[in-house]
């Protein structure tokens, strides 16, 4: 397709922005039914877009981008298993991971739905054996602790989801997650473990990932020291497709759970990569987790674009980043259980859309890749909200909250959850409408302080509410952002499903390792790196 920025549709949007940019949310909310008009439902989520900087004309022009970019055709192609990942010639089928068993989908001659449910069945049997006590460690003890060793998509997804759904961990099994090659990560976990009741899940598609295999070998050595070599088979399982490497490590390939090339790591939490999560929350709730994904998939696939929540949120992201010049996007869950959600979204969004060339390799001329960040409320209010409220940078924000907590405590006449949500609603209100100098002066504030206390408002927010943080709702939330990524990638005409930017650093690390460890002379090819390595070697 043509570069979207060269099209008449983009020019029309540019002209519209010139006329619209001074419009305020105070003005927009003079429309009586605005909140109702811009509130939508999707897969159990209640999504209010009304506090965003848009009106009907803006939305019409943004929706024109979807037609210009061929979004409908690309959505259909993705769900059909066409090879949208053109640089690796692969299908993009994370949506198949949550298809019902009776679904009919074949790709490249393979019955995808049958393959997915065969692996799910094996995962279910294994998780059930762990939770029931039928799977025993080498010395006959039941498993109480799972240590998931992976990195990137093999860590961020299951780690986030396991914490988010900790209220569903009812079988006495808990999980720890180790990813960093910094030895402090693994050491801090191992020092509190009982080897006899610990199971390690090594998650690496190729079983060659440097960080993961370094940690896995160290964990293996620790276990062998405690229980002996023969214990490995009962205390290690693998999520991988490399049976030869898994067997070399000492893991029985009957305890290897695979996935497919059409699943990118950052889209894999609902594949075998979620084995640790399934073991902790149980197969029934894991299937509900998948059900939430599928419900959002169906909303995305079948709902008309003007009511399609992932599409509307994606278009708003393009509007803010390419027209308002917003550089970042805050995700603010008012839920401590979602404390790792923003970190998870960083990989999902930034590894996907952090690209500078089109699908055909030509340079892009628009911005791409929103920078995602965030922390749970109310912690963020006492840290960075100052900048969002009164700073010079526009930071669109998604607020995520729930009507019912899993646990609550009294707080005087109210409950702590009610206080949490009072803050939630207050923040979106103040960000939207603020308080101007005239209103502040009318309160008797000293004139020299008025400008310091002005709250400009006009900071856009999206509110996402659900009744409760359940497995299904978490699946729907994740799928929502997966589809936002896809839509933006189509509009920018980039490949959201490769990640070549991470490869060169890996290669260079392997090349430099002998010099860093002192096995070879330092000769990196540049004087700065040489000097730094020499300092490191002299001071370690």
UniProtKB/Swiss-Prot annotation:
GO cellular component: cytosol
Gene3D superfamilies named in the record: 1.10.1390.10, Glucose-6-phosphate isomerase like protein, domain 1
Taxonomy, superkingdom: Bacteria
Localization terms from the record: Cytoplasm
Transit peptide in keyword set: no
Entry's Gene Ontology BP terms: gluconeogenesis; glucose 6-phosphate metabolic process; glycolytic process
UniProt keywords, alphabetically: Cytoplasm, Gluconeogenesis, Glycolysis, Isomerase
EC number assigned by the record: 5.3.1.9
Record-linked Pfam families: PGI
Pathway noted in the entry: Carbohydrate biosynthesis; gluconeogenesis; Carbohydrate degradation; glycolysis; D-glyceraldehyde 3-phosphate and glycerone phosphate from D-glucose: step 2/4
Active site: 351 (proton donor), 382, 506
Signal peptide: none
Family affiliation: Belongs to the GPI family.
Protein function: Catalyzes the reversible isomerization of glucose-6-phosphate to fructose-6-phosphate.
Protein name, entry field: Glucose-6-phosphate isomerase
Organism whose genome encodes this protein: Corynebacterium glutamicum (strain ATCC 13032 / DSM 20300 / JCM 1318 / BCRC 11384 / CCUG 27702 / LMG 3730 / NBRC 12168 / NCIMB 10025 / NRRL B-2784 / 534)
């Amino acid at each position: 397709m043509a570069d979207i920025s060269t099209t008449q549709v983009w020019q029309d949007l540019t002209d519209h922005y010139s006329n619209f940019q001074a419009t305020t949310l105070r003005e927009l909310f003079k429309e009586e039914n605005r909140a109702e008009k811009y509130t939508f439902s999707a897969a159990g989520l209640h999504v209010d877009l009304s506090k965003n900087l848009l009106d009907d004309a803006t939305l019409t022009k943004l929706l024109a981008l979807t037609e210009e970019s061929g979004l409908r055709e690309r959505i259909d192609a993705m769900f059909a298993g066409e090879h949208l990942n053109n640089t690796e010639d692969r299908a993009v089928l994370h949506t198949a991971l949550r298809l019902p068993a009776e679904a009919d989908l074949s790709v490249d001659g393979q019955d995808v739905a049958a393959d997915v449910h065969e692996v799910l069945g094996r995962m279910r049997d294994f998780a059930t054996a762990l939770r029931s006590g039928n799977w025993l460690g080498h010395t006959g003890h039941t498993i109480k602790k799972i240590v998931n060793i992976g990195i990137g998509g093999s860590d961020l997804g299951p780690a986030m989801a396991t914490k988010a759904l900790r209220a569903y961990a009812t079988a006495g099994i808990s999980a720890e997650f180790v990813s960093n090659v910094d030895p402090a990560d693994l050491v801090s976990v191992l020092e509190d473990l009982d080897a006899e009741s610990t199971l390690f899940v090594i998650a690496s598609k190729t079983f060659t990932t440097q960080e993961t295999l370094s940690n896995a070998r160290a964990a293996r050595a620790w276990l062998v020291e405690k229980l002996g070599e023969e214990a490995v088979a009962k205390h290690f399982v693998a999520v991988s497709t490399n049976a030869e490497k898994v067997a070399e490590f000492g893991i029985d390939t009957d305890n290897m759970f695979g996935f497919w090339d059409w699943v990118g790591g950052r889209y894999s939490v609902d594949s075998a990569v979620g084995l640790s999560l399934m073991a902790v929350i149980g197969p029934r709730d894991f299937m509900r987790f998948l059900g939430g994904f599928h419900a959002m998939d169906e909303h995305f696939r079948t709902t008309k674009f003007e009511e399609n929540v992932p599409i509307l949120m994606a278009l708003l992201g393009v509007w803010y980043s390419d027209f308002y010049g917003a550089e970042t996007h805050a995700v603010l869950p008012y839920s401590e259980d979602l404390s790792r959600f923003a970190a998870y979204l960083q990989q999902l969004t930034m590894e996907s859309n952090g690209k500078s060339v089109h699908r055909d390799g030509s340079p892009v001329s628009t911005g791409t890749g929103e920078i995602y960040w965030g922390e749970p409320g109310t912690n963020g209010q006492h840290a960075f909200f100052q900048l969002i409220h009164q700073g010079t940078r526009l930071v669109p924000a998604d607020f995520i909250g729930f009507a019912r907590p899993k646990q609550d405590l009294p707080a005087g006449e109210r409950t702590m959850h009610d206080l949490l949500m009072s803050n939630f609603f207050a923040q979106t209100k103040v960000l939207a409408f603020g308080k101007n100098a005239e209103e502040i002066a009318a309160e008797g504030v000293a004139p020299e302080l008025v400008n310091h206390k002005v709250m400009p408002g006009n900071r856009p927010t999206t509110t996402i509410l659900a009744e409760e943080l359940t497995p299904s709702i978490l699946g729907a939330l994740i799928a929502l952002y997966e589809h936002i990524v896809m839509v933006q990638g189509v509009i920018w005409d980039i490949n959201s499903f490769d990640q070549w930017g991470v490869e060169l650093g890996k290669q260079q690390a392997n090349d430099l390792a002998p010099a860093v460890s002192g096995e070879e002379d330092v000769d990196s090819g540049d004087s700065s790196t040489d000097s730094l390595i020499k300092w490191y070697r002299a001071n370690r």
